[in-house]
């Protein structure tokens, strides 16, 4: 480190001297490129140690594959399920319970019972597209009940018609679109009967080994669809529920009713399971199911023979199929079903592609690949070879007829050997090329190892493809990364003569490399002195000198320019492209390998994968939603708005037992009657007559309110006239009340304006009230006496008998019945 510090100090002092004695005309701008930028390469203490690996072994290439031409057909395992049609038959009984009120019928409850249709009725469906309107229900105790459609007690035939809601896989036929709904007696519960025959044309799927099959409606039958009762196929359903008929005639499609086309079924099975009867055609398994399916045909293929296997190569599929050398014999009937198909394919491919130039080299062979694919291989041979072979045989026949067959075989073997030799020669050439390349690489590494002892940095930089500083430390290389300087600050001096401390250029000593000045990146703008090295490497210091050689011409490369120094002075700069290149690179002229775009091989298409599942969830959900929509439409047509209190009270009272049920009937009748009354009033108010009547009543109420208001206002304004109307009578009238005579005389005004009132006679015990009041002033005692007199007068008028009182005194009808035989007594007599 001390030596490095001294070196940098010397460089700094020299740079200071040069800056004093040099001006801008003494240097030029140096060029650079991106591959070799201006850099300082020095070896630090912490470096990486590297070495060349010369222990490389090159194995010779050897191929033991034998190629032959032909084409092949590939079959895959058929994963699709066995699909067949199934019909289901069901009788659906509906018992709706209703309650009838005045003008409305409430739907309370509905009981649905499903029954499997008997076989004899299914025969009627299959032959005439009809079913019966009566159903026999057998209880576990042996009791048989009969139910009739619409409670008509008649067994008739009903026509089947398609349901509006259907899916792709299912078609449903019914006899009753809207369930029968009877209107019972008023204020009583009633139950009616409705029969609906439901026939569904569904699709069933079974998967190998065919131990069960599932319908698209979601129903399952635990048994083989190929079971005929005696062939030993798996069947787990009760055999007493299974009926097998032979030579059965049935309507093929129920869409046209009894006019539909009929078909003859060799064997048909009827299975009663739960509330459904199933029927399907029984077929032979070997005739209906094939376990193999054609996948693809490779019209141009190669077969490479190795020690233990065959490799079937397809350029079209960019794939190779590996199979063992043992060929197969397809004996299973589920596999021999493909024989006619692939023999036809072999004939068609040969006639269309190979008939002109090739001949079949023997019969086809069947192999099983490692991916469980069945491969049928058809070898081919060129006709030109066959013609040559036949010509040689014919020539031999003229000379020697005894040894024809042996020479024919020898000639064929020779021709095949020639083909194999050419093939092996090409393969060996490629192998030798690979081995030679390996040996050349080994020798190149050895040469680089030796050259690294002379110029380690150059060798390592070429190996890594970027500037690297390297130094040989014994038997290993120490490498480090070079430090890049500020590229724009590098300046190349025009003079290569040595300058002493006084600034005088020497005539005898010169620099062997041009001087440059530069600065570091992201540092102070101090200029550092160095010398230009190879590939734009900057060598620190200026101690690399030599004796001047006059005359001399030296060219130094910097970036994309070549700087020419004549007699150690820069004369000009030329582009590096003007200097001719010494081409020492030996190019390998070989065509590149043809592009191979790999194809995505779909062994099974999405449609096949979907058909491989026995349970098709999508179709089952579609069927469920379609049937649910149909039921919703039917229920919407028969359902009515039932008051919530009716169902609530009915459910509560049903929990109380028989007493609660009876009490609930009474309460329901009463509540229904009250509800009808309230509903009648509301309905009356809703019609035009009721609305007009209510408007008239409202007007009458308003008029009454106005009259009462006016009368009340009149009372407030004239209380005496309203409270004592008799006070307005003439004073000349004489009233006798209870033996009292009151004589009223007209009032006479005196001179003072007063009024004199004279009372002639009063009842015994009463004081005479008379006097003359003058003026407008009355004392409180006078006012009190006047009020008492008014009160007495009012009471006398109120005690006067009237016609209404005499009428009210008559006994009522109830009193006369109650007190019959008695006679009323007069009050005076009493």
Swiss-Prot record:
Disulfide bonds join 41-482, 58-438, 131-197, 290-337, 510-548. It is found in: Virion membrane; Host cell membrane; Host endosome membrane; Host Golgi apparatus membrane. Residues 634-686, 644-685 are annotated as: Hydrophobic membrane proximal region. Residues 20-688 are virion surface. One of its GO terms (biological process) is symbiont entry into host cell. It is a single-pass type I membrane protein. The chain crosses the membrane at residues 689-709. Glycans are attached at residues 155, 247, 286, 329, 361, 486. The record marks 399-400 as: Cleavage. Residues 98-104, 184-191 are annotated as: Involved in fusion and/or binding to host membrane. It comes from the Viruses. InterPro entries: Glycoprot_B_PH1 (IPR035377), Glycoprot_B_PH2 (IPR035381), Glycoprot_B_PH2_sf (IPR038631), Glycoprotein_B_ecto_C (IPR055341), Herpes_Glycoprot_B (IPR000234). One of its GO terms (cellular component) is host cell endosome membrane. Residues 1-19 form the signal peptide. Residues 710-830 are intravirion. A motif (Internalization motif) lies at residues 822-825. Keywords: Disulfide bond, Glycoprotein, Host cell membrane, Host endosome, Host Golgi apparatus, Host membrane, Host-virus interaction, Membrane, Signal, Transmembrane, Transmembrane helix, Viral attachment to host cell, Viral envelope protein, Virion, Virus entry into host cell. The keyword Cell membrane does not apply. Envelope glycoprotein that forms spikes at the surface of virion envelope. Essential for the initial attachment to heparan sulfate moieties of the host cell surface proteoglycans. Involved in fusion of viral and cellular membranes leading to virus entry into the host cell. Following initial binding to its host receptors, membrane fusion is mediated by the fusion machinery composed at least of gB and the heterodimer gH/gL. May be involved in the fusion between the virion envelope and the outer nuclear membrane during virion egress. Belongs to the herpesviridae glycoprotein B family. Homotrimer; disulfide-linked. Binds to heparan sulfate proteoglycans. Interacts with gH/gL heterodimer. This is Envelope glycoprotein B. The lineage of its organism: Viruses, Duplodnaviria, Heunggongvirae, Peploviricota, Herviviricetes. The gene is gB.
């Amino acid at each position: 480190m001390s030596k490095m510090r001294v070196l940098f100090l010397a460089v700094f002092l020299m740079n200071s001297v040069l800056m004093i004695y040099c001006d801008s005309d003494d240097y030029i701008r140096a060029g650079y490129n991106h591959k070799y930028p201006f850099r300082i390469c020095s070896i630090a203490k912490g470096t990486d140690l590297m070495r060349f690996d010369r222990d490389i072994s090159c194995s010779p290439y050897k191929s033991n594959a034998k190629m032959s031409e032909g084409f092949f057909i590939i079959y895959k395992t058929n994963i699709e399920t066995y699909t067949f049609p199934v019909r289901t038959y069901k009788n659906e009984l509906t018992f709706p319970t209703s309650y009838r009120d005045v003008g409305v019928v409430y739907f309370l409850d509905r009981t649905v019972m499903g029954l499997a249709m008997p076989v004899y009725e299914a025969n009627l469906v299959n032959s005439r597209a009809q079913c019966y309107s009566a159903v026999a229900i057998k209880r576990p105790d042996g009791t048989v009940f009969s139910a009739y459609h619409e409670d008509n007690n008649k067994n008739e035939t009903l026509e089947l018609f398609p349901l509006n809601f259907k899916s792709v896989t299912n078609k449903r036929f019914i006899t009753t679109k809207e369930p029968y709904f009877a209107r019972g007696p008023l204020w009583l519960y009633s139950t009616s009967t409705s029969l609906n025959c439901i026939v569904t044309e569904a699709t069933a799927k079974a998967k190998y080994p065919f131990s069960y099959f599932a319908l698209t409606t979601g129903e399952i039958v635990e048994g083989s669809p190929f079971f005929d009762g005696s062939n030993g196929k798996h069947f787990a359903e009760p055999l007493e529920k299974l009926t097998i008929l032979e030579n059965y005639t049935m309507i093929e499609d129920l869409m046209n009713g009894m006019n539909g086309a009929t078909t003859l079924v060799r064997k048909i099975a009827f299975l009663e399971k739960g509330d459904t009867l199933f029927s399907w055609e029984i077929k032979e398994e070997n005739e209906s199911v094939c376990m193999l399916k054609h996948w693809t045909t490779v019209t141009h293929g190669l077969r490479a023979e190795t020690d233990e296997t065959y490799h079937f190569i397809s350029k079209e599929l960019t794939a190779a199929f590996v199979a063992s050398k043992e060929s197969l014999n397809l004996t299973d009937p589920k596999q021999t079903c493909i024989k006619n198909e692939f023999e036809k394919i072999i004939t068609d491919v040969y006639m269309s592609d190979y008939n002109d130039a090739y001949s079949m080299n023997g019969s086809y062979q069947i192999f099983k690949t490692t991916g469980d694919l069945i491969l049928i291989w058809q070898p081919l041979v060129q006709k030109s070879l066959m013609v040559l072979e036949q010509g040689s045989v014919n020539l031999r026949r003229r000379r020697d007829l005894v040894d024809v067959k042996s020479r024919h075989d020898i000639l064929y073997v020779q021709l095949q050997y020639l083909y194999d030799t050419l093939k092996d020669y090409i393969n060996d050439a490629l192998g030798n090329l690979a081995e030679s390349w390996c040996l050349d690489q080994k020798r190149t590494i050895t040469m680089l190892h030796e050259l690294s002892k002379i110029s380690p940095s150059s060798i390592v930089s070429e190996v890594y493809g970027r500037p690297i500083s390297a130094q040989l430390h014994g038997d290993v290389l120490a490498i480090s990364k070079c430090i890049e300087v500020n590229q724009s600050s590098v300046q190349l001096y025009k003079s290569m003569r040595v300058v002493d401390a006084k600034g005088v250029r020497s005539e005898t000593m010169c620099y062997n490399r041009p001087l440059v000045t530069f600065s570091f990146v992201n540092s102070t703008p101090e200029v550092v002195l160095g010398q230009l090295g190879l590939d734009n490497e900057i060598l620190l210091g200026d101690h690399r000198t030599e004796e001047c050689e006059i005359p001399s011409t030296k060219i130094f490369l910097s970036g994309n320019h070549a700087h020419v120094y004549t007699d150690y002075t820069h004369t000009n700069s030329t582009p590096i492209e003007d200097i001719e290149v010494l081409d020492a690179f030996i190019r390998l002229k070989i065509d590149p390998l043809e592009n191979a775009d790999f194809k995505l091989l779909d062994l099974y298409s999405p449609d096949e994968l979907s058909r491989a599942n026995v349970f098709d969830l999508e179709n089952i959900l579609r069927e469920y939603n379609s049937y649910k929509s149909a039921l919703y439409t039917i229920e919407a047509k028969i359902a009515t708005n039932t008051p919530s209190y009716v169902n609530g009270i009915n459910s509560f009272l049903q929990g109380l037992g028989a007493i609660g049920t009876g009490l609930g009937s009474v309460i329901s009748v009463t509540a229904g009657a009250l509800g009808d009354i309230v509903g009648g009033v509301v309905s009356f108010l809703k019609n035009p007559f009721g609305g007009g009547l209510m408007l008239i009543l409202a007007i009458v109420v308003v008029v009454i309110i106005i009259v009462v208001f006016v009368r009340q206002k009149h009372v407030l304004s004239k209380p005496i006239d309203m409270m004592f109307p008799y006070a307005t009578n003439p004073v000349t009238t004489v009233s006798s009340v209870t033996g009292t005579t009151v004589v009223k005389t007209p009032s006479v005004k005196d001179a003072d304006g007063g009024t004199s009132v004279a009372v002639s006679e009063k009842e015994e015990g009463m004081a005479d009230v008379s006097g003359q009041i003058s003026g407008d002033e009355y004392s409180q005692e006078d006012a009190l006496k006047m009020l008492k007199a008014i009160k007495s007068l009012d009471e006398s008028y109120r005690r006067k008998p009237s016609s209404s009182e005499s009428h009210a005194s008559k006994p009522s009808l109830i009193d006369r019945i109650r007190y019959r035989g008695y006679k009323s007594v007069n009050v005076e007599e009493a």
